[in-house]
């Protein structure tokens, strides 16, 4: 099979992926690489939203999961990477509602059943987008087992869990405070609320004492407490004013009452340690129905909450008549105006505050007192904590266990109901007296109700409820399946730190409760992919990258259109276009999936934030080209020739052969350790350095010398080493760069006496310590140092690459004689003269261990001195420019960090060059 002259990722990626999937290579057991008796290895894909498209975070984590999957599959494990998607209740419902809006259709007019039919229709048409994109990245999931959280089997598991928890007394319905999105009109989880600092106001309002304590003569303001608030509209629901019990200013007033402005109510002055005496006036309004902290204070002081908002964010009929029906922000404006009119608004100050907004609607989220379904968490949390404390579940890096523990030690009951139509409908029914009957289906509920007429609860379950069951529901639970026995606990969960509580902890608790097993043995927490400057990637910032654009490339106009369409604030389009044109004047070139995967792996350290630099993609695309060209060289020199495959033929391994074979063993050891430690960056670095720095840059050059030696045995051994080391290196790199390694392996494998249909079914390389030859490794280290020294001498003497000159060398004669062919070829020498001592001359001398080296050339000392002096002056001028720039605080403070760092690197480079120039001048006697 002849290789193309250049590496074309697009040509090979689709061809190989369709073959891998079509042949069933991604499946565990006999259909894959390992039998049922092999050790089980399983990874659960965190199910992306069915509405979603592949973003950089997905692509990053999927690369790591696929690398682990391919690695363990090649190691002979019975390997399953379980894929699937999440129904994403809120996100999906919004997408379909927006489509209906474009047709001027309201879902409420359509009705629940018809709307759900539309959602399912959309899911079938568009729901597989992210799965197709994962395939482009090379994900070797078992797609035959792909699951969806609303599938029949998974839905049955959800119902079973709800019913069991309810009957165990762990699920209840109650009125509590929740995050409420008034646009969606549903409760939302903390993860669906994004808080950001915004400019606002702090209003200081006078709450008059109920009984005049100091008089109100001559039209003066009544006496009272001045309360500071950022939300005057909620004062209509105030039930108390709180002060700190140790605040001397107000201690004598505790137990008294104030009149609630604009309302005909009296509320108490209470003492609570929660109050910060330094904030505002030290007096805080307490609105238990519309603030989470106030709710807790209200519970402590037995205050009855008074909700004053409707579900769509308007003032309800429990407030004074003049505010009823007003939108909450219109009510705020009217309340402030009325307070001012009644001389009760003391002052208004600008104030920065954290404003919580729904991540889907951008609407300000309201704490709202509503009836919801809850899971009692304390007992479940205890078992979850024990699992980590005992080591049954291990976090990597270890510090994330602390975050997990903090969440579970301070856990609250879990609100699991959502006021949506799309999702798992809560399996609870009500009779006319509002009695609740929880059952697996309507028929069972009617039996429990004695045949009475029942109506099912309208709410659906929080998406995280079904996601919490993912590790065991996808394996067939509640049925007792072979997959459940084989693959649970799964091996590792690869996920982000932002969902340690929302997903990771809940999976641990649910799996322990229902299966008696932990869901996974290890949790590898990845960092967050950010842009090159360290900023979070977001549509509004205009710095989002599409992984497929990095694979296929994208023209500048198309990139601008993609970045500026669908903005929440269209006014940002101009600045985003400007930034994009500056960053990508030629658009984004095609790097291919392998280069992108290798980039992600190289970035996968144990840090919290990961800066994505596209220059790395370019570097790893160059790596792929280098590997491709190395394979072409090996094929051209080995195909149709004797590569030592017959055992009886004589072989004669040189130090260079033994060195590269030994270095391969060291690389295999290091890569295996890196996978064990989840240090994908170390695995990538080791593979890169071995292939590029040692095999390509050094061994191929040594091999050229050996192939030109005229010695048939040396040539045969060299070809054998070339082919076998390359074939092994391809297997070593395959989990990270699967496409190019498969394409090359098909051609290289026969030269190394390897047979098989695919590289992904081959055994993963394992180090053989007996192949380490310390003597050869030491000799080649010395040879490389001598070659580099000769190259440095050539540079110092300003010799052109085409100019070949003799070398005078002093040292061990046998060693120099052995090194001679390599030195002549790689250092471009015409001859090597081994001397007892070097002659006195102005030419520079290199000392390498016990060896002394000098190039035998005549030097025009005056001309060389003049050249070096001019170069020294130039470098000093450049150094001064760089020093001036770095001393300028405007430059250092305002220029991008990357630019400042580049300037520092330039200065360091000039400093090094200056030292070398001075050293050369000194050798010339200057």
Curated annotation (Swiss-Prot):
Reactions catalysed: tRNA(Val) + L-valine + ATP = L-valyl-tRNA(Val) + AMP + diphosphate
Motif 'HIGH' region per record, residues: 48-58
Subcellular location: Cytoplasm
Any one Gene Ontology molecular-function term assigned to this protein's record: valine-tRNA ligase activity
Sequence motif: 'KMSKS' region, positions: 536-540
BP GO terms, sorted: valyl-tRNA aminoacylation
Coiled coil: 859-924
Enzyme Commission numbers on file: 6.1.1.9
Listed CDD domains: Anticodon_Ia_Val, ValRS_core
A GO cellular component entry from the record: cytosol
Annotated residues for binding of ATP: 539
HAMAP family (UniProt xref): Val_tRNA_synth_type1
Family note: Belongs to the class-I aminoacyl-tRNA synthetase family. ValS type 1 subfamily.
Protein name: Valine--tRNA ligase
Naturally occurring in which organism (per UniProt): Nitrosospira multiformis (strain ATCC 25196 / NCIMB 11849 / C 71)
């Amino acid at each position: 099979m002849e290789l193309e002259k250049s590496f074309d990722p697009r040509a090979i990626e689709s061809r190989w992926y369709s073959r891998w999937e079509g042949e069933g290579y991604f499946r565990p057991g006999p259909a894959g690489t390992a039998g049922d008796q092999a050790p089980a290895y399983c990874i659960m894909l965190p199910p992306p939203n069915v509405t979603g498209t592949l973003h950089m975070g997905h692509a990053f984590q999927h690369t790591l999961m696929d690398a682990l999957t391919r690695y363990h599959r090649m190691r002979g494990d019975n390997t399953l990477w379980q894929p699937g998607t999440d129904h994403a209740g809120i996100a999906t419902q919004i997408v379909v509602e927006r489509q209906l809006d474009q047709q001027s259709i309201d879902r409420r007019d359509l009705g629940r059943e018809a709307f759900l039919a539309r959602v399912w229709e959309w899911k079938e048409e568009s729901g597989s987008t992210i799965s197709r994109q994962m395939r482009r990245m090379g994900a070797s999931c078992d797609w035959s087992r792909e699951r969806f959280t609303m599938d029949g089997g998974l839905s049955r598991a959800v119902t079973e869990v709800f019913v069991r928890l309810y009957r165990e007394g762990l699920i209840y319905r109650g009125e509590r405070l929740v995050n409420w999105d008034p646009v969606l009109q549903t409760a939302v989880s903390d993860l669906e609320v994004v808080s950001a600092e915004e400019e606002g106001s702090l209003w200081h309002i006078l709450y008059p004492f109920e009984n005049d304590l100091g008089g109100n003569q001559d039209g003066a303001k009544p006496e009272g407490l001045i309360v500071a608030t950022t939300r005057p509209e909620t004062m209509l629901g105030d039930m108390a004013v709180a002060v700190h019990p140790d605040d001397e200013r107000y201690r004598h007033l505790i137990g008294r009452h104030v009149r609630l402005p604009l309302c005909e109510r009296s509320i108490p002055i209470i003492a609570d340690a929660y109050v910060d005496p330094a904030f505002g006036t030290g007096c805080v309004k307490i609105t238990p129905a519309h603030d989470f902290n106030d709710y807790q204070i209200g519970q402590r002081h037995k205050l009855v909450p008074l909700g004053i908002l409707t579900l769509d964010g308007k003032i309800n009929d429990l407030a004074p008549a003049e505010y009823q029906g007003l939108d909450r922000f219109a009510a705020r404006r009217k309340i402030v105006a009325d307070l001012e009119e009644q001389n009760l608004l003391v002052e208004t100050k600008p104030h920065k505050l954290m404003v919580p907004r729904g991540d889907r609607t951008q609407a300000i989220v309201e704490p709202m007192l509503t009836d919801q379904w809850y899971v009692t968490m304390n007992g479940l949390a205890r078992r979850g904590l024990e699992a980590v404390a005992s080591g049954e579940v291990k976090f990597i890096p270890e510090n994330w266990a602390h975050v997990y523990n903090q969440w579970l030690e301070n856990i609250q009951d879990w609100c699991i109901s959502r006021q949506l139509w799309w999702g798992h409908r809560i399996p609870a029914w009500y009779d006319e007296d509002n009695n609740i009957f929880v059952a697996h289906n309507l028929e069972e509920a009617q039996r429990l109700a004695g045949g009475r007429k029942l109506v099912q609860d309208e709410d659906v379950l929080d998406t995280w409820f079904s996601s919490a069951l993912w590790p065991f529901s996808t394996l067939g639970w509640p049925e007792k399946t072979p997959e459940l026995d084989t693959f649970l606990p799964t091996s590792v969960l690869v996920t982000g730190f932002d969902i340690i509580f929302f997903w990771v902890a809940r999976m641990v608790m649910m799996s322990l409760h229902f299966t008696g097993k932990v869901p996974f043995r290890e949790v590898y927490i990845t960092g967050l992919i950010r842009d090159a400057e360290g900023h979070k990637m977001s549509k509004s910032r205009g710095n989002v990258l599409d992984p497929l654009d990095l694979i296929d490339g994208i023209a500048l106009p198309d990139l601008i259109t993609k970045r500026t369409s669908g903005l929440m604030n269209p006014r940002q389009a101009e600045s985003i276009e400007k930034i994009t044109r500056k960053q990508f004047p030629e658009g984004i070139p095609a790097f291919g999936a392998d280069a992108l995967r290798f980039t992600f792996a190289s970035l996968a350290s144990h840090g919290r934030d990961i800066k994505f630099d596209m220059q790395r993609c370019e570097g790893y695309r160059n790596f792929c080209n280098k590997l491709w060209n190395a394979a072409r060289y090996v094929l051209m020199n080995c195909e149709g020739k004797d590569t030592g495959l017959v055992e009886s033929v004589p072989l004669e391994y040189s130090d260079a052969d033994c060195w590269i074979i030994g270095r391969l063993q060291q690389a295999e050891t290091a890569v295996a350790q890196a996978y064990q430690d989840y240090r994908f960056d170390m695995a990538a670095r080791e593979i890169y350095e071995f292939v590029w720095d040692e095999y390509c840059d050094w061994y191929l050059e040594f091999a050229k010398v050996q192939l030109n030696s005229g010695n048939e045995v040396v040539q045969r051994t060299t070809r054998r080493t070339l082919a076998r080391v390359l074939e092994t290196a391809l297997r070593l790199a395959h989990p990270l760069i699967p496409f190019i390694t498969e394409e090359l392996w098909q051609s290289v494998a026969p030269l190394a006496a390897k047979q098989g249909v695919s590289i992904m079914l081959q055994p993963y390389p394992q180090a053989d310590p007996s192949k380490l030859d310390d003597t050869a490794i030491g000799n080649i280290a010395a040879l490389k140092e001598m070659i580099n020294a000769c190259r440095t001498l050539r540079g110092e003497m300003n010799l052109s690459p085409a100019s070949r000159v003799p070398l005078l060398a002093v040292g061990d004669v046998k060693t120099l004689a052995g090194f001679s062919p390599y030195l002549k070829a790689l250092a471009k020498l015409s001859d090597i003269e081994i001397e007892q001592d070097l002659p006195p001359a102005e030419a520079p001398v290199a000392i390498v261990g016990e060896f002394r080296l000098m190039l035998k050339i005549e030097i025009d000392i005056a001309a060389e001195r003049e050249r070096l002096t001019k170069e020294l002056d130039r470098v000093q001028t450049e150094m001064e420019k760089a020093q001036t720039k770095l001393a300028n605080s405007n430059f250092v403070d305002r220029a991008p960090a990357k630019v400042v760092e580049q300037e520092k690197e330039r200065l360091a480079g000039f400093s090094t060059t200056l030292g070398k120039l001075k050293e050369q001048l000194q050798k010339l006697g200057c």
